[in-house]
UniProtKB/Swiss-Prot annotation:
The gene is queF. It catalyses: 7-aminomethyl-7-carbaguanine + 2 NADP(+) = 7-cyano-7-deazaguanine + 2 NADPH + 3 H(+). InterPro entries: GTP-CH-I_C/QueF, NADPH_dep_7-cyano-7-deazaG_red, QueC, QueF, QueF_type1. The keyword Lipid metabolism does not apply. GO terms for biological process: queuosine biosynthetic process; tRNA modification. This is Putative NADPH-dependent 7-cyano-7-deazaguanine reductase. GO terms for molecular function: preQ1 synthase activity. The active site is at 52 (proton donor). Its EC number is 1.7.1.13. Its main location: cytoplasm.
């Protein structure tokens, strides 16, 4: 370190559960006489274990199978204690329903309460390959949110 004019340490606070990491880094920097900066990176989407609230819209055109509403509610309630990103949750719900129902067409749209003032409303859709519903899925995806609705409940 004596070959350099100044040496500084940077720690990224990204929401890690072990705050001890930051404390130890701070102490080592102090012992070495190094200036230490802690950059708060929590805005990068850490999973905070705080509840998220959403309205989930599910629309589908069945083929041979339908989902029973109570079963669907129980499945969706299982996400209450599930820590994941909004996009992953909606994609998983969509894929699970496609695997279960083998529908002609399905779409899932999650409208989540904003985090940090930014609204993330992920959308998933599926159209059975080789049918007109495959084209419908593509068309709906291109038109999805083309004219966003006015949101006044957030």
């Amino acid at each position: 370190m004596q070959h350099y004019e100044t040496v500084e340490a940077v720690t990224f606070a990204y929401g890690q559960h072990h705050h001890l990491e930051i404390q130890i880094t701070r102490e080592i920097a102090k012992e070495q006489g190094i200036r230490h900066h802690i950059l708060d990176m929590s805005l990068l989407g850490q999973i905070t274990a705080q509840p998220d609230f959403a309205t989930i819209h599910i629309s589908y055109i069945p083929d041979k199978l339908c989902v029973e509403s109570k079963s669907l509610k129980l499945y969706l309630f299982s996400y209450r204690n599930h820590g994941d990103f909004h996009e992953n949750c909606i994609n998983t719900i969509g894929k699970d329903l496609v695997n279960l129902l083998d529908p002609r067409y399905l779409e899932v749209w999650g409208k989540f309460t904003p985090r940090g003032g930014i609204s993330i409303d992920p959308y998933y859709n599926y159209g059975k390959q080789g049918t007109k519903y495959e084209g419908l899925a593509e068309q709906r995806l291109f038109q999805h949110d083309l004219y966003p609705e006015k949101i006044d409940n957030r």
